[in-house]
């Protein structure tokens, strides 16, 4: 049966509505979701250590009707650089925030991130912050130990633990009980070092079969994004390498040559490796003064130089020959390009105002430098903040503790300050290299470190049964950046 015309019209109209949508029944599209962006200007700022940057302007740009506030967090810079206002604040539309960065204790170039969050929304922007280290006419090398992991901080007689962990209250590193494999740790340590004037790390090294230091150096330290900010040299630890056997046999010489050939192939070619003169790679040779017989030392050095020449390098050897308890020996000194003394504490105990420690070094610095200069050998003065291994070597040794203060009432770091100002820097100024050596940046086992610690009140108490077996009644304090501040200040005031 044929439908009436009006029915066909109705069906046609409804069909068109189904195809095209009837205006009266469609829902409007949802409004755009409110959002925001972060804008940072300028793209880079700079200052130098001790200074403050020009302002960085941070703005919130609302989108699609966004009317909320944003929690803004600033990240990407190390300890020792301080934003103002603080690293977290509220940002609102129409009220840009000016940020400045002061740099009392860190240097380097960093990508600073400004991260904004509001509920589920998150956006960020960045600027480049460059903090230049202070001018430094000296080479300042500090012994650096890449051997820390969780076990290294725990007491194991002769090998593990720290004095600072046994003090009451404890005075641990500012970075905590860190792992040397952590790149953020290495970045922070480089930033602290170069800001204080340390422009060289002499890196403790023994073969991989002895300890995993080589892996940390090659795969962590030398891969760090900031390794170009500092130079490094190898610190050849003969004592650990050969188990404190100082009889220099032909087999040991062969092993030494092999080790240095490894240096030539894997380290000397690195752009940050310390070279002096006409591209001569520097190596510190630890415990050189203990090697015997002297004739074997002479032969070893001659053979070593020949092997390095064959490898394409005129090596610069700094021998550990300075011992203030022994007169200088020209026969020994003459083997090296320069001499230094890793362990200047030499068994002294107590405060330097009482024990003649600094007076001894004053006399022997003069004697050793004169003897070295007569042989055409440079003298690298060494300085230490103190020494105390009594919480680590509780059974295997009974070494005295050398205080970090000149007296109990003196300021924290006063011995280091006097050693550096009156001896190390003036003697370095009177040398060709103009170099000083610091024992150490981070040897926490022997408490020679100048790496920043947490800040605490002074104490003489420790966790030993007597309450002072480790401190020997000497004053210890969590010192923060005190030693790095002293170093930076004294370098700035020195006359090279």
Where are these regions (language model features)?
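Bacterial N-terminal signal peptides that target proteins for export
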Residues: 1-12
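Solvent-exposed, well-ordered amphipathic alpha-helical segments
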Residues: 3, 61, 71-75, 86, ...
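Intrinsic structural disorder/low-complexity segments
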Residues: 8-9, 100-101, 283
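Cysteine-centered motifs
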Residues: 14-17
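C-terminal motif of bacterial Sec signal peptides marking the signal peptidase cleavage site
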Residues: 19-21
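Glycine-centered flexibility motif
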Residues: 23-24, 50, 68, 104, ...
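Long beta-sheet-rich domains in secretory-pathway and surface-associated proteins
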Residues: 26-134
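Glycan-processing catalytic domains of CAZymes
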Residues: 133-496
């Amino acid at each position: 049966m044929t439908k009436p015309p009006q029915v066909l019209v109705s069906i046609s109209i409804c069909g068109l509505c189904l195809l095209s949508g009837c205006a009266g029944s469609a829902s409007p599209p949802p409004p755009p979701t409110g959002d925001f962006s972060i804008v940072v200007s300028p793209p880079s700022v700079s200052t130098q250590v001790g200074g403050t940057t020009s302002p960085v302007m941070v703005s919130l740009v609302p989108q699609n009707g966004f009317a909320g506030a944003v929690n803004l967090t600033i990240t990407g810079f190390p300890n020792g650089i301080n934003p103002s206002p603080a690293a977290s604040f509220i940002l609102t539309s129409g009220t840009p925030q000016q940020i400045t960065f002061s740099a009392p204790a860190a240097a380097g170039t960093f990508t600073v991130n400004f991260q904004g969050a509001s509920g589920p929304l998150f956006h960020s922007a960045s600027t480049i912050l460059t903090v230049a280290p202070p001018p430094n006419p000296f080479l300042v090398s500090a012994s650096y130990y890449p051997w820390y992991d969780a076990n290294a901080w725990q007491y194991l007689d002769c090998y593990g633990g720290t004095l600072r962990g046994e003090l009451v209250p404890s005075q641990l590193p500012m970075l905590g009980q860190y792992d040397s494999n952590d790149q953020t740790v290495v970045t922070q340590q480089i930033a602290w070092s170069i800001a204080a004037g340390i422009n060289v790390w002499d890196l403790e090294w023994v073969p991989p079969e002895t300890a995993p230091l080589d892996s940390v150096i090659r795969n962590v330290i030398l891969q760090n994004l900031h390794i170009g900010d500092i130079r490094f040299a190898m610190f050849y630890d003969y004592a650990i390498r050969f188990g404190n056997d100082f009889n220099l046999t032909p087999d040991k010489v062969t092993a030494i040559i092999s080790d240095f050939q490894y240096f030539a192939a894997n380290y000397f070619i690195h752009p940050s490796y310390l070279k002096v003169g006409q591209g001569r790679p520097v190596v510190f040779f630890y415990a050189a003064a203990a090697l015997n017989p002297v004739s074997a030392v002479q032969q070893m050095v001659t053979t070593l130089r020949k092997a390095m020449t064959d490898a394409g390098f005129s090596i610069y050897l700094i021998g550990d020959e300075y011992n203030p308890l022994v007169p200088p020996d020209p026969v020994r000194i003459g083997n090296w390009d320069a001499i230094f003394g890793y362990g200047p504490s030499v068994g002294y105990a107590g405060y330097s105002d009482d024990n003649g420690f600094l007076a001894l070094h004053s006399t022997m610095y003069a004697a050793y430098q004169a003897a070295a200069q007569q042989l055409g050998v440079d003298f690298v003065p060494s300085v230490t903040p103190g020494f105390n291994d009594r919480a680590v070597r509780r059974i295997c040794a009974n070494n005295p503790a050398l205080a970090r203060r000149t007296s109990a009432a003196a300021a924290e770091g006063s011995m280091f300050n006097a050693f550096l100002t009156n001896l190390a820097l003036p003697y370095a100024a009177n040398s060709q290299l103009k170099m000083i050596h610091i024992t150490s940046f981070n040897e926490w086992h022997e408490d020679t470190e100048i790496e920043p610690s947490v800040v605490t009140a002074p104490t003489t108490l420790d966790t030993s049964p007597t309450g002072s077996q480790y401190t020997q009644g000497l004053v210890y304090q969590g010192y923060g950046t005190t030693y790095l501040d002293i170093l930076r200040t004294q370098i700035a005031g020195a006359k090279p």
